[in-house]
């Protein structure tokens, strides 16, 4: 599947920019490590120590992860979204 091309003058996002991606899944270290690895694959400069916020659910069963990545193109963002959405344990991606 290809990403439709949007002319730069029609895009609402100016690249490069810092872009937050929110992911929700099970509250396990394995899941978090796997999602971080997927993000790093498409955003090699991503530093989880400084650009990852973790928010556990009230029951502790799930965790919300906010990754702030330095996005250089729509294609890069689409690739990150596809990767984290494709993880079998991911519940939501915003």
Q: Model segments located where?
A:
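Long, contiguous binding/interaction regions
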Residues: 1-64, 68-94
């Amino acid at each position: 599947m290809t990403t439709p091309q949007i002319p730069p003058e029609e895009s609402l996002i100016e690249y490069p920019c810092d872009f937050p991606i929110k992911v929700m899944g099970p509250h396990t270290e394995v899941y978090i490590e796997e999602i971080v690895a997927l993000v790093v694959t498409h955003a090699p400069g991503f530093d989880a120590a400084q650009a990852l916020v973790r928010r556990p659910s009230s029951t502790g069963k799930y965790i919300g992860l906010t990754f702030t990545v330095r996005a250089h193109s729509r294609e890069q963002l689409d690739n990150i979204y596809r990767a984290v959405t494709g993880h079998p344990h991911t519940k939501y991606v915003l």
